[in-house]
């Protein structure tokens, strides 16, 4: 009996020996693909290759790709633990051809691997093809020799695959394993196909078409093959078990979880299966850079962790346990995926922290649920309960649904959505929080800012606000504002964004600070309480996020250098009109009467970086406002200053009044790169820039693009601009030559079409489709009118999914037939409209499939216009 590792290795070796490049598994977070939460299929890393956007050094590949299906369109989370084959995490074995081999080889490889390498009996395999795919059917039946009794044709719902609504697509061929008549279920395509007897183990996708927006299929110039076979399913077949949870990959994990729960190692418990599945997904998600969060990928991870923890609680495990399953997982899969043991300590630490946080509210939430269930008169859990569990106790909705399912209950999702809508309404009110927090309730006290010299401190809660109103307590899940008597958090002002970080009670309750705002003389920490409660009078530890503060400081100091450089190059009339100083960039608006030249911008950037390399110290003084102005410090017009001000000086180069946070020396900035310049209003320009590591990355990306362009035009980076100019000149020449050839073709087309003219009542009529652009169509109409004399001409062309129509009528006919009327009647038949002069008119349409019929109607329309039968 082969182990899962042996099956994986056998698959990769089989295809490697047949010219395939073995490609390591990509991370679960797709690179440069915002449309996907996670890598959910083996073809995802090759998506751009299939779309023709990326070239690789091979045309055949194979992989064992780790995948997650939880959240988003593909979500198996709710089914895990209740079926034999659903998983949040699984491995997809796949072989791929990018314009190399096609159906015959793909089918032969699949059959050979299953029947010879793995040794599955042919009489146990059942094959399906797309109902219209005669080519694949012929290969299976007449070349492979599959028994027609174990072969079927299936419709598009199951056996036609597409990457999206448009783009590459094609028929599938699926291979099923028959567990035998003792297992209930029927063959694919039968009414009993959902039974467990026939299990799909391999799907071969033949991408041979390109579907356009109208649903039309055109042959792909480079047909491709994309196959996928779940390792866990194949292992179940090979190891002679009916459930994926009985294979070796899961036995060790289920045994370890059972030991933690004090259960026998061979327990057949759904909760053990859930835990074993979820540790795989969670460990590999963290390995690939996902961390628990309240949105996006991080929230999906949090949901999976909390579902596993709840099942552990259900088994009676009364202490953090989930992280202890990482070691047996690494023992089982670390050989195939070495990145897991490399990051094992991080995975264990994050899982432990997340479980500890959730356990603090898990028991309370379950108690609330039990109380509500005791009062329940029907079979539906109220939406208010579902919402409270999610909002206050951190229960993801699917976790509550899981509990309901175990008790044959359902959720009132309409009621839940109503609660969510009300919360969103409150959130919209919070969006005005920055401008005016609480209409009528303002903080009257004062916060002492201690954050110039330290990023951590302690402060007493002076006030709490929720929904704009002063409250005495904030509870878990609630949004609000916390004001301390002293804080290291910088509050948004002077263009610098407010700090982020956390406030923490002595008991470990965490308030996540997403922004810090001025509230009168106080610093308001705006955010959400993760768990527990905070009361007025509590003493909290305040911790600023050091990374974002430092990145913001780089940009703020660079803003001062930029301001001085602008005044030095463009003139002292330059005044700051606004700014944004954030961790990822700086934006500076300034008064200037024209766009700076390229040379001026280069000079400004050079001066700023000269000052950075000079490594000047940031000297900070507090002095009287008048004294500061007398020393040459710049004050911003419209800004309010007190009697005492803070002056920031970088040598003699820059002296400004500023209350923001900054670097200690200009050299800390590293590099400043201007990335855009433009106008935002009359007499106001805007520059955006990046600093530090982000500036380096921006330069590197730009260099990469230059190298790519140079390679494309076959030149060195130094000569790329000259080469591009040469190519543009050549292109212009070719466009002129193309125009000449179009004229020649139009003349030829006119001669050819003239011979097709039909005489209707003394009028020569031509209606034809001509593949040409608008100008060529017009020229051809003119050619035909000159050749035919008394004539009516209607020409049509298709460009993509659009129709072009041009009509011409000789002047001696325009009293009986108007070109505008005629082309309008034809255009209506192709879903369009148009018009023009009596002797010449144009139109367009949206239904190219009706063009031939529309053109065929021209003769009848001319007869009607001439009054002929």
Curated annotation (Swiss-Prot):
CDD domains: AlaRS_core. Its cofactor is Zn(2+). It comes from the Bacteria. SMART domains: tRNA_SAD (SM00863). It is found in: Cytoplasm. Its main location: cytoplasm. Pfam families: DHHA1, tRNA-synt_2c, tRNA_SAD. GO terms for biological process: alanyl-tRNA aminoacylation; negative regulation of DNA-templated transcription. GO terms for molecular function: alanine-tRNA ligase activity; aminoacyl-tRNA deacylase activity; ATP binding; tRNA binding; zinc ion binding. Its EC number is 6.1.1.7. GO terms for cellular component: cytosol. Binds 1 zinc ion per subunit. Zn(2+) binds at residues 556, 560, 658, 662. PROSITE patterns: AA_TRNA_LIGASE_II_ALA. InterPro entries: aa-tRNA-synth_II/BPL/LPL, Ala-tRNA-lgiase_IIc, Ala-tRNA-ligase_IIc_anticod-bd, Ala-tRNA-synth_IIc_core, Ala-tRNA-synth_IIc_N, Ala-tRNA_ligase, Ala_tRNA_ligase_euk/bac, DHHA1_dom. Keywords: Aminoacyl-tRNA synthetase, ATP-binding, Cytoplasm, Ligase, Metal-binding, Nucleotide-binding, Protein biosynthesis, RNA-binding, tRNA-binding, Zinc. It catalyses: tRNA(Ala) + L-alanine + ATP = L-alanyl-tRNA(Ala) + AMP + diphosphate. The keyword Cytoplasm applies. Consists of three domains; the N-terminal catalytic domain, the editing domain and the C-terminal C-Ala domain. The editing domain removes incorrectly charged amino acids, while the C-Ala domain, along with tRNA(Ala), serves as a bridge to cooperatively bring together the editing and aminoacylation centers thus stimulating deacylation of misacylated tRNAs. Catalyzes the attachment of alanine to tRNA(Ala) in a two-step reaction: alanine is first activated by ATP to form Ala-AMP and then transferred to the acceptor end of tRNA(Ala). Also edits incorrectly charged Ser-tRNA(Ala) and Gly-tRNA(Ala) via its editing domain. Belongs to the class-II aminoacyl-tRNA synthetase family. This is Alanine--tRNA ligase. The gene is alaS.
